Every structure is written in C-alpha cells, then in structure tokens.
Amino acid sequence: MNKDWTSIKKVGLPKLKLIMEHEIMSIYRTKEVLIQTEHEKMFVAFCQKVYKYKEYKEETYWYVNDGTTKVEDEVVAWMELPDRYEGE
C-alpha cells in the first residue's frame, strides 16, 4: 500500500468529531478524505459513526456527494485530501 494511504484494518478511521448528542444516540463525523473500497473504487467521502445507547449498537457509514449517497462497498483505506488550489 502507498505510504500516504491509511489502512482502516491496521490504523482505524480518521479522527471523529461529535456533531450531535441526544439522550438516545450520539453522532460523530470525520472530515472529507479520499477513500478506497474493497473493489478498488475511489471517492471523496466522510465517515459517520452512530452510537445508539438503547440498543448498545454502533454503526459506521461512509457518505459521498455531501452526505446524499452512502458507500455500499467496504472501505479499506483512506488518505488526507491535498490543500485546495489557491490560484496563481
């Protein structure tokens, strides 16, 4: 694996930030990163982790297109996005 890629299996997810807390659940989200799936597809996406207290359940999802589309394949690696182009 390229040195810039981070294996989810070996290292884990990007840093999660709490975005919503409620008495029945908490939702955490990462910033957008470049991901690669088990089928070698690549997307710019963010990860969202939901903790459901009543069910003692933890769910992790990846989303693309500003959160409108869920990534169905298993995400195996991620890398930081480069800085935005500022122009000349």
Give residue spans per PLM region.
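Secondary-structure transition motif
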Residues: 1-88
